[in-house]
């Protein structure tokens, strides 16, 4: 009986193994600590009364200050590397601000320099319209117009158009460059009148436009066609010399080159040459170039397709009156701009 009781007591002291698995132990709760301050430029600035720029991690629990120079593990402070990081952030921010300021200053300087060359970009449409109307009505019935018409009657119209328009395009670019150079020199050496800067280039351009406007209207009001006949006779003489040389009509390239030289010489110092200089000095050169090229292209195309038919649809006097009126109108606009400025 005693043996049975002892065995029972020994069995009851043994651990009982259950079939179910035991849940994992709950980890101990870590006390909540204060959030690290952000590494912004403002947080890097030293506070009043602080001697060292060291960012520490605060604890919810009160206690003695934690030693510096320890790691993240046991609630320890960040090393002094944060001070150098803040210094780099400040230096980077200052560098970015200085770079932006220098770029803006450089862009402003380059824009002012380009504006002296290309003029006011907002005045392109006005310069285009003025140059187109002025060149178109100036070239109708001009010596260059008759030269293109006479050459097209004896050669291919496309070849004559290329040679004529090429010469007029080069002449236009030269005129605009001269006008813009005069405007640039006037900006460097200003002329003072009454205590204010007086735009000499715009004034001379207006005077030149007035001169051509008055002479064109006087030729139209004279009642005879001597001026137009003189232009046509000069064109016929130039074309006869061109054809008499025999240089040229051998190939398309030689014909284009000969036409280019003939028109370039005839156009040099012409009324449209000086009027383009005047417009470029007072208006946007980009608009003047585009408008002049468009006006030359349309007038040359009319001359090549059938310049002799122009008189059946449009009177020579009407063309002269329109051209002279445009010269005076553009001169008046230039003078008004001078007064307003």
From Swiss-Prot:
The chain crosses the membrane at residues 79-99, 117-137, 158-178, 203-223, 246-266, 286-306, 318-338. It is a multi-pass membrane protein. Residues 1-41, 54-76 are annotated as: Disordered. Keywords: Chloroplast, Membrane, Plastid, Transit peptide, Transmembrane, Transmembrane helix. Its main location: plastid. It is found in: Plastid, Chloroplast membrane. GO terms for cellular component: chloroplast membrane; chloroplast thylakoid membrane; Golgi apparatus. One of its GO terms (molecular function) is manganese ion transmembrane transporter activity. InterPro entries: GDT1-like (IPR001727). Belongs to the GDT1 family. PANTHER family: PROTEIN PAM71, CHLOROPLASTIC (PTHR12608:SF6), TRANSMEMBRANE PROTEIN HTP-1 RELATED (PTHR12608). This is GDT1-like protein 1, chloroplastic. It comes from Oryza sativa subsp. japonica (Rice). The lineage of its organism: Eukaryota, Viridiplantae, Streptophyta, Embryophyta, Tracheophyta.
